Amino acid sequence: MQAIDGNKDVNKIYGWIEVGGNGSTSNKTNASKGIAANAPAAYDVYSNTIQLDQAALYFERIENTAQKDHFDWGYRLTLLYGTDYRFTTSHGLLSQQLLVKNAQYGFDPVMFYYDAYLPKLGRGGSVLRVGRYISLPDIEAQLAPNNYTYSHSILYTYDCYTQFGANLTTKVNDHWTIQEGISPGCDTMPWTTDARVTGNVCVTFTWTNGANALNTCDNTINNGKYAYNNLTAFYETYYHRFNATWHTDTEFWYQYMKDVPNMYWYNSGGLYAKSATTPFPETNGAGVNLNFGAVCEDPRAPAAQQSARCYAPEWAITNYVEHNFWHNTASLNIRNEIVDDIKGQRTGTPAIYEEHMVGFDFWSGSTITFRPELSYTKCYSKYTTPDGKPVSCTDISAGSSIASDESQVLGNGAIPTGRGKTESLTLAADLIWHF
């Protein structure tokens, strides 16, 4: 891939256009209304469609960290348009496209930051980054060419995407790298009522000449109380290179929020009203079917046994096995994962999810990437309908499974489409043109 200016200057302009499509056993999608039936999968979230996932444009200058003589600086501005804006959106920054309109397509300035290289701080120097940047941990990445596959793991879909603040990365020596920073929280801008002063600390230990790396990260250090995506999250990621063509990555996280509203509390109208203590969503109502709370107790329990709020945790583990072949012009991608959304706060349904994916990357020159894949998702819901069927946790609009839970478990509402559906099979592919 060549930048627009032919890489002749330290300031680069480049980008890509990514178009994707899929065929899925989940068939309740209405893309024009933002109903994404492939959830909890991402980014191929709209089933049985062809879509513009990303049209991305980069403006950047990369600081020179190969020298120790002098200060240097860099910057990046990334402009993104497409369906994938719904994953990168930060509350308070053009977020009405998603949180009010639930639009299929949207625009997001996903990165805008300044880097300052400090060569004398640490044996390997330090970089201070200020602005909006990609959240530090994770195997996967939001921007299409930076990811192994077209789709993303469920683990990645429901954790932190971006932060706005400052981070210092220091290479202590050839083995240890330390990162620390401060922000208003995950996917939240500082001028919103959801903003919380939030710290983060990550440590990476690398050994055997880079063949092994262990990253430990506390990504959100604050009070952990309910707010927009205010996830207290602990990460452990391990990378191992077997040889020149095979490697594996494994990631585990445990997340939680405290004092999360109970979707089934009898006085939900007052609890869910937008206020300083419950600032999200931007649009709200008095019903119990809002999709931002948790299933704190069994929905079939009487009102007297339902708590107003609860502790809502979840854990997940994902593994990738990667093999490069054809002189690094193609790769085999294998992903396996388990996610336990204990209180349903992330996906909308208290359930254990397993997902398995096999895919390929094929490069045609330096301009075209083609990534086909086949994935299977199975969920094990923790509740059943009055006639004993499992509550739906696939083929339902992202986050709205709570509404289906109420209708099915309590038996007092219209039967939702997709009732009892607990698995999905998806054949998907994307094509990326780099410029």
Residue ranges and their predicted role:
Residues 51-56, 107-111, 161-163, 196-200, ...:
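Transmembrane beta-barrel architecture of outer-membrane proteins
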Residues 184-187, 222, 255:
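A short, flexible beta-alpha/helix-coil linker loop
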Residues 4-25, 29-188, 193-200, 204-208, ...:
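Outer membrane beta-barrel
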Residues 41-44, 88, 98-102, 210, ...:
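Outer-membrane beta-barrel pore domains
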